[in-house]
Swiss-Prot record:
SUPFAM superfamilies in alphabetical order: PE/PPE dimer-like
Function: Plays a major role in RD1-associated pathogenesis, and may contribute to the establishment and maintenance of M.tuberculosis infection. Together with PPE68, stimulates the secretion of IL-10 and MCP-1 from human macrophages, via the interaction with human Toll-like receptor 2 (TLR2).
Name used for this protein in its record: PE family immunomodulator PE35
Species, as recorded: Mycobacterium tuberculosis (strain ATCC 25618 / H37Rv)
InterPro entries membership: PE-PGRS_N
GO annotation, cellular component aspect: cell surface; extracellular region
Keyword entries, A-Z: Secreted, Virulence
Residues covered by the PE domain: 1-90
Subcellular location field: Secreted; Cell surface
Main localization category: secreted
Family: Belongs to the mycobacterial PE family.
Length: 99
């Protein structure tokens, strides 16, 4: 039978993943201002269409990024939960053996 173990550093890794995801959301929010505030290069119709297309594509990309960051945040929280559960079980088992 193979011994199961877990490294307590997993909780720190989960926290870092969650923090990185939150930074990604913040960066996306900052980028939204630049993407939606693009002014057409000229007064012609092509420039207006290009600016509109850029804005539309940028908004879609940022929405995709926000979704990905949300999934990363959830994954980080899941790793933290698993690490917490392992620690609680290990502490409980250690208490039984200490008695």
């Amino acid at each position: 039978m193979e011994k199961m173990s877990h490294d307590p550093i997993a909780a720190d890794i989960g926290t870092q993943v969650s923090d990185n995801a939150l930074h990604g959301v913040t960066a996306g929010s900052t980028a939204l201002t630049s993407v939606t505030g693009l002014v057409p290069a000229g007064a012609d119709e092509v420039s207006a269409q290009a600016a509109t297309a850029f804005t539309s594509e940028g908004i879609q990309l940022l929405a995709s990024n926000a979704s990905a960051q949300d999934q990363l945040h959830r994954a980080g929280e899941a790793v933290q939960d698993v690490a917490r559960t392992y620690s609680q079980i290990d502490d409980g088992a250690a208490g039984v053996f200490a008695e």
